A protein has these predicted regions:
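Terminal amphipathic alpha-helical/low-complexity segments used for targeting or macromolecular assembly
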Residues: 164-464
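Structured, charged N-terminal subsegments at the starts of enzyme catalytic cores
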Residues: 1-4, 8-9
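Glycine-rich hexapeptide-repeat left-handed beta-helix
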Residues: 9-32, 37-241
């Protein structure tokens, strides 16, 4: 542990160790606190009644009270009050306030804030931004509200919308009204980049990792919401009519084109996830008959059906979380080590449980009977998967291209000609085709196409 120039540390625990030392620096004031291994609290940070998880970084006069920060959080310049900051909650800006909310994998834009007080019965309201949600500059949410996973919040939202069943959406304010664009973030280059960067930014060096983190963008947790979202959008269309210009949902408005695109985006993601699961399940085995395929498809456990939850980084079946809670209530689980061991077991068995869930959804979505599935059914699913993966990658590719458009070059080549502006842009940003992200997308299309073709070839000759 390294403590240097600190103003006050009162009534706290510093859980440092040799593999992941804690650094507490100049001007820091902490009262009633716990700081976990590998964390750095520096430069005038003020903490009151706070828990700081592993490998967090708090600095530049950050101020927090009554809050929990789990692993790999970053807080600089701004303020937090009564928040549950799950892994990778990041706020960098002086004018940003996070208050009375639950967040994880979240990036707060400058000037983002929320209100939990409506000047009636006091500050009693709270809200949730599910994993991967982010806010733009000067965004505002009046709690209570719930923002769906991997959604983007832009503008001021005061109507208490719950969009948890419409993940990967944009929430945009126009003339004091929340407009919802469902599923559009699935094709965003930013979403894919986020998913790639989080594992790389895991700074934990402590061999005893306290948080179990699942980085999967598509999981039973998000796909179950897409199934619900697809049903919601189809029902809105049925009730209000296909020709309606605007649909109303949860005090938000959805344009006709956005609704139809939302259904399409969710179906693409469902095809992608279920196809991924089936390819993974059948990989590396030479099947001789349809019966062999059916036997391989059968799940290894019954655990995994039903609802799934995000436990601040850990994605698990709700049935397993309920089983743990029952154990705590009846006294059979009475040690923190036992609770942690349960979480570890859920995390380790994620793919086993995931397949149980996916197997049931494959039957439901594709209308298949488990006793009658044939190689031809699998080929049909894999072809739909291939179309979904390539289609989504092409959308991401087109989204990335916008970053290399003429309008993106504005601001380069300070006072030169149009050609100098273009040259300056290319010197700094490179050209589109050689961009590392773009080449990765093209390789992904190639690899996934080959993967699908390999399975089709492997089982294509099975007739019986």
């Amino acid at each position: 542990c390294h403590i240097c120039g600190t103003c006050r540390l009162s009534n706290g625990s510093v859980n440092s160790n040799v593999t992941a030392p804690v650094h507490i620096g100049h001007g820091v004031i902490c009262d009633d606190f716990i700081i976990s291994s590998g964390s750095k609290v520096d430069d005038g940070t003020m903490l009151t009644r706070c828990f700081v998880g592993q490998s967090c970084k708090l600095g530049h006069n950050y101020s927090a009270s009554d809050s929990l920060f789990f692993s790999n959080c970053q807080g600089e310049n701004g303020e937090a009050c009564a928040i549950f900051a799950g892994p990778f909650t990041v706020t960098h800006h002086k004018s940003t306030l996070l208050i009375a909310g639950m967040f994880s994998f979240m990036n707060a834009g400058s000037g983002s804030n929320q209100s939990n007080h409506m000047y009636k019965l006091g500050p009693i309201h709270q809200g949730t931004m599910e994993r991967g949600a982010k806010t733009t500059s000067d965004s505002y949410i009046l709690w209570p509200a719930r923002v769906g996973a991997f959604s983007l919040v832009m503008g001021r939202h005061v109507n208490h919308a719950d969009t948890s069943n419409l993940p990967f959406s944009y929430l945009i304010e126009q003339r004091n009204t929340t407009y919802l664009v469902p599923g559009v973030n699935l094709r965003s280059v930013g979403t894919i980049r986020d998913a790639q960067k989080w594992p790389k930014r895991d700074k934990r060096k402590d061999p005893n990792r306290l948080d179990y983190i699942n980085y999967n963008l598509l999981s039973p947790y998000t796909i179950q919401k897409m199934f619900k979202g697809r049903s919601i959008l189809k029902e809105l269309k049925r009730v209000s009519g296909e020709t309606s210009e605007i649909y109303s949902y949860q005090s938000a408005k959805i344009k006709n084109s956005s609704l139809n695109n939302g259904i399409r985006f969710y179906e693409i993601a469902i095809h992608k996830f279920l196809g991924n699961s089936i390819i993974k399940r059948l990989e590396g085995i030479n099947f001789q008959s349809n019966e062999e395929i059916r036997q391989r498809l059968k799940p290894d456990t019954e655990i995994g059906t039903g609802e799934w939850v995000d436990m601040s980084g850990l994605i698990a079946p709700k049935s397993e979380i309920d089983r743990l809670l029952d154990g705590i209530e009846n006294g059979s689980v009475n040690r923190l080590k036992s609770i942690n061991a349960s979480f570890a077991e859920m995390h380790e068995n994620y793919y086993t449980y995931e397949w149980t869930w996916a197997y049931n959804k494959i039957q439901e979505f594709y209308g298949l009977n488990p006793d009658e599935i044939t190689a031809q059914d699998i080929i049909r699913i894999v072809k739909a998967w291939k179309e979904a993966v390539v289609g989504l990658d092409k959308m991401v590719y087109d989204d990335a291209r916008k970053e290399f458009s003429l309008s993106s070059m504005t601001g380069f080549g300070a006072d030169g000609s149009h050609d100098e502006m273009k040259q300056d842009f290319e010197q700094v940003r490179g050209d589109f085709e050689s961009n590392t992200f773009v080449t990765a997308v093209l390789k992904h299309i190639e690899d996934k196409t080959a993967l699908g073709n390999e399975l089709i070839k492997r089982i294509g000759s099975i007739q019986e």
